[in-house]
Amino acid sequence: MKVMHLLPSLSSGGVEQVVVELCQGLCARGVETVVVSGGGPLEKDVTAAGARHITLPIGRKSIRTFLMVPRVAKLIREERPDVLHLHSRVPAWVGWLAARRVEKALRPLVVTSFHGFHSVNFYSAIMAKGDRVIAVSECMKRHILENYPATPEEKITVVPNSVDTSLNFPEYRPSDDWWRQWRHDYPELEGKFTLCLPGRITRIKGAAHLIPLLSDLRARGIPAHAVIVGETKKGKEALRQELEDAFAIAGLQDAVTWTGFRRDLRDVLCACDVTLSLTLIPESFGKTTLDALALGRPVAGYEHGGVGELLDVFLPQGKIPVGNTSAMADLLATWYQTPPTPKSPIPSPFRREDMLQGHLHVYAK
């Protein structure tokens, strides 16, 4: 079997990480794997797994990107993949149109993955046009059926994102060298009740909700400190500055650490006391939430989307009504005194092997 993945880039993000994990698992099972994207920091992880990477600008939201359709069609003819797996809307349009240009004898099975709750319109409908459609959670499947009713339910398979339990487990601890470097880089965290907010710097990630949350906890005498872990992508610099100014106005400039993009997120999650999910709109899954829970770290998050589903399974007390920072402060104040323990070990279908078998089952159809 040969699988070709199309996605915008290989920068940080949940979709990119899932593709890296698929490359690792598929290549280990002898499945020839090719990734087509605009490239990025995670490209080395793809090639280290044994997959090949082909750099093409197929992720830009521009009409010019559709000039890539003939090139991708040519690539399909040359590579002859059995499966064309499309992971995002612009690459999905390019890949779907390219596949339709290929002679039927060479046309691969087209699989699309709904990784997020996209706006419902013609542009997003491409994600439901695959021969097979993967939803990363039950709430994602409901979203597809409710908003794209022409999609037969039997065409949709729920394959949750996963965690590698050989790497993420409650007993895992960062190395002594890592701890020394962490304390050297961020001495302000010593003795603090650290709250990790992972994810790219975007408005919907809810970083602004840290302001009332930190203010409330500090008013109770709890030395709460936010650790915001994620890159500020080009075009988001003004938002980053807006957030920094808001923290400063609230007198919280010394209560926040910005780490930028970190390749060692597993260690960072272990180093922090609690991981937060403050997304203002539902997430389709919540990959970092699962990673933290697998490490035995408590997660407090807004009770919607995939994060709500995960907390239902692993730590129901961590669910907070969306936007209710007062309720979250009450919960965290309790956890400051008595940290909870998430459910362990990781059950099916959230293990890496479950995800790989789920994808192979879809590909085999």
Question: Positions of the model-derived regions?
Answer:
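A conserved mid-protein helix/loop that constitutes part of the nucleotide-sugar donor-binding site
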Residues: G13-E21, F193, L197-D216
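A charged, aromatic-enriched C-terminal amphipathic alpha-helix characteristic of glycosyltransferases
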Residues: G14, L167-P170, P174, P339-K365
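Short hydrophobic beta-strand element within catalytic cores of glycosyltransferases
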Residues: V35, P298-G301
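Glycosyltransferase donor-sugar binding loop
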Residues: V36-P41, P198, H225-Q241
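Short His-centered aromatic/hydrophobic patch
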Residues: L86-A92, F114
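A conserved, positively charged/aromatic
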Residues: K104-E138
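Active-site donor-binding acidic/aromatic loop of nucleotide-activated sugar
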Residues: K234-R240, Q253-R262, V268
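Conserved acidic donor-binding segment of nucleotide-sugar-dependent glycosyltransferases
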Residues: V313-S326, A333-P339
